[in-house]
């Protein structure tokens, strides 16, 4: 079996040893190399799962590909669910990439709730992870938010499971090719109308040509450093957030002068305080809050639909009446 090539992979061993094999799961099966490899991997690890395939009808071949996947799953004795949303031309919308993703995740969530699946396996690999990290760098993400995708994360209250994040794409393809396993070549993955495709087809090859080396591993290393930084920041932040109290105006975060000596941590504490109230603060907003705290001046600021009151010794998110 093709996945025997990875039977000594310690990260995979650790991942699967943490799973409850008595439960049943979903596998997002596109038919591409990544999800197909993951299908065989799950079979080899005795995971009980159902494959779900979403056929958007974007390609002339997609109907036949869905039928072929159904036949393959029947041959492999894997339960199979086929979903065909209302057809949409991928060229008609600038946001079709994100819209399709939202549709899939809502479908996965609904299936998990209706059929009692414990989580969804996704075939994201190391190259996908590197793309995610570089995209976040260019978007100006906080250093603590450059960790990329997590191997296990909750989507609402459904687990998203990504065991392949450390495995490069080429190793997955080599494993399938060496065993003559056919997989779908999705041409939309190369359609440069989509940002991910432009990064994959143009940006990454260009950067690797300029630097003369693979840039995936340094990006993954950056993600690891970011994850460690995030863990440290969360540990340092927790005691300050425990001091949050309700007063006559709303939620109050007391700020001590000692905290203000470390601007990086002070702004992170404020950022998490706002997030706990479902408010996303920009870097410029956090800097403004910090500046007022440092000078001891009072300010009333707007953050989405809420009023934030900054005073000499604290930050208040005012209640909505």
Swiss-Prot record:
Gene Ontology BP annotations: tRNA modification
- Print the keywords alphabetically: ATP-binding, Cytoplasm, Ligase, Nucleotide-binding, tRNA processing
Keyword Cytoplasm in annotation: yes
Which InterPro entries does the record cross-reference, listed alphabetically? Rossmann-like_a/b/a_fold, TilS/TtcA_N, tRNA_Ile_lys_synt, tRNA_Ile_lys_synt_N
Q: Listed GO molecular functions?
A: ATP binding; tRNA(Ile)-lysidine synthase activity
Q: Which of the seven top EC classes does this enzyme belong to? A: ligase
Any one annotated GO CC term: cytoplasm
- Annotated compartments: Cytoplasm
Q: Which reaction does it catalyse?
A: cytidine(34) in tRNA(Ile2) + L-lysine + ATP = lysidine(34) in tRNA(Ile2) + AMP + diphosphate + H(+)
Going by the entry's taxonomy, the superkingdom of the source organism is recorded as Bacteria
Return the similarity comment: Belongs to the tRNA(Ile)-lysidine synthase family.
**Record's domain comment?**
The N-terminal region contains the highly conserved SGGXDS motif, predicted to be a P-loop motif involved in ATP binding.
Which HAMAP family does its entry note?
A: tRNA_Ile_lys_synt (MF_01161)
- Could you tell me what this protein does? Ligates lysine onto the cytidine present at position 34 of the AUA codon-specific tRNA(Ile) that contains the anticodon CAU, in an ATP-dependent manner. Cytidine is converted to lysidine, thus changing the amino acid specificity of the tRNA from methionine to isoleucine.
The identity of this protein, by name, is tRNA(Ile)-lysidine synthase
Which gene is annotated as encoding this protein in its UniProt record? tilS
């Amino acid at each position: 079996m093709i996945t025997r090539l990875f039977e000594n992979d310690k990260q995979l061993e650790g991942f699967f040893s943490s799973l409850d094999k008595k439960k049943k799961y979903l596998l997002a099966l596109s038919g591409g190399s990544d999800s197909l490899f993951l299908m065989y991997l799950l079979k080899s690890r005795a995971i009980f799962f159902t494959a779900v395939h979403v056929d958007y009808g974007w390609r002339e071949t997609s109907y036949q590909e869905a039928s072929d996947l159904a036949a393959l799953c029947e041959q492999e004795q894997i339960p199979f669910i086929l979903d065909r949303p209302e057809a949409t031309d991928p060229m008609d919308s600038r946001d079709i990439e994100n819209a399709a993703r939202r549709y899939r995740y809502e479908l996965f969530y609904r299936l998990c709730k209706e059929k009692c699946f414990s989580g969804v396996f996704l075939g994201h690999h190391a190259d996908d992870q590197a793309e995610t990290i570089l995209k976040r760098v260019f978007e100006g993400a906080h250093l603590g938010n450059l960790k990329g995708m997590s191997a296990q994360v909750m989507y609402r209250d459904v687990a998203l499971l990504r065991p392949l994040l450390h495995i490069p794409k080429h190793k997955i393809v080599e494993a399938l090719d060496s065993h003559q396993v056919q997989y779908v070549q999705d041409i939309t993955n190369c359609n440069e109308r989509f940002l991910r495709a432009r990064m994959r087809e143009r940006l990454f090859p260009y950067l690797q040509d300029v630097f003369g080396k693979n840039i995936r591993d340094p990006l993954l290393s950056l993600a690891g450093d970011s994850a460690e930084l995030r863990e440290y920041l969360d540990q340092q932040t927790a005691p300050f957030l425990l001091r949050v109290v309700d007063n006559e105006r709303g939620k109050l975060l007391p700020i001590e002068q000692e905290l203000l000596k470390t601007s990086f941590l002070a702004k992170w504490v404020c950022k998490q305080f706002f997030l706990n109230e479902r408010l996303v603060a920009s870097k410029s907003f956090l800097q403004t809050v910090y500046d007022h705290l440092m000078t001891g001046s009072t300010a009333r600021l707007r953050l989405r639909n809420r009023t934030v009151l900054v005073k000499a010794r604290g930050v208040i998110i005012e209640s909505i009446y």
